[in-house]
Amino acid sequence: MYNPKEHFSMSRIAKGLALTSVAAAAVAGTAGVAAADSGAQAAAAHSPGVLSGNVVQVPVHIPVNVCGNTIDVIGLLNPAFGNECEND
């Protein structure tokens, strides 16, 4: 038997699912790769005014080591125990 309330709720669920999938596709489609260079090279060209367009850049070199970092409740059962990491 046809129940309009059930049809309405399924319609809302289907619309919500469609909207969620479209939003997820939009977020995934705009994701990109972040790339950075260690050198600071910039210029403020054709900037009218005394304080407009001033560029100050400071290159920061921090060695980051992310291999083998885990969080465990019991440290003796750490799955990364014995791993060796090097900074290239």
Swiss-Prot record:
Question: Domain of life here?
Answer: Bacteria
UniProt signal peptide: 1-36
**How is it applied?**
The small chaplin mixture (a cell wall extract of an rdlA-rdlB knockout) forms a stable coat on a number of surfaces (including Teflon and cotton) and emulsifies oil-water mixtures, which could be useful in medical and technical applications.
Q: Which phenotype arises from disrupting this gene?
A: A strain deleted of chpF and chpG makes rodlets. Deletion of all 8 chaplin genes on minimal medium leads to severely disrupted aerial hyphae that collapse on the colony surface and are not hydrophobic. A few spore chains can still be made, but they have neither rodlets or amyloid-like fibers. rdlA and rdlB mRNA are down-regulated. Deletion of all 8 chaplin genes on rich medium leads to a reduced abundance of aerial hyphae without rodlets and occasional spore chains on surface hyphae.
Main localisation, per the record? other
Which cysteine pairs are covalently linked by disulfides here? 67-85
Keywords attached to this Swiss-Prot or TrEMBL record, sorted alphabetically, are:
Amyloid, Cell adhesion, Cell wall, Disulfide bond, Fimbrium, Secreted, Signal
The residue ranges of the Chaplin domain are: 47-87
GO cellular component, alphabetical, reads: cell surface; extracellular region; pilus
Q: How does it assemble?
A: Homodimer; disulfide linked. About 20% of ChpF isolated from cell wall forms disulfide-bonded homodimers.
Role played: One of 8 partially redundant surface-active proteins required for efficient formation of aerial mycelium; the short chaplins assemble into a hydrophobic, amyloidal fibrillar surface layer that envelopes and protects aerial hyphae and spores, presumably anchored to the long chaplins. Chaplins have an overlapping function with the surface-active SapB peptide; chaplins are essential on minimal medium while on rich medium both chaplins and SapB are required for efficient aerial hyphae formation. Chaplins are also involved in cell attachment to a hydrophobic surface.
Listed name of the protein: Chaplin-F
Q: Which gene encodes it?
A: chpF
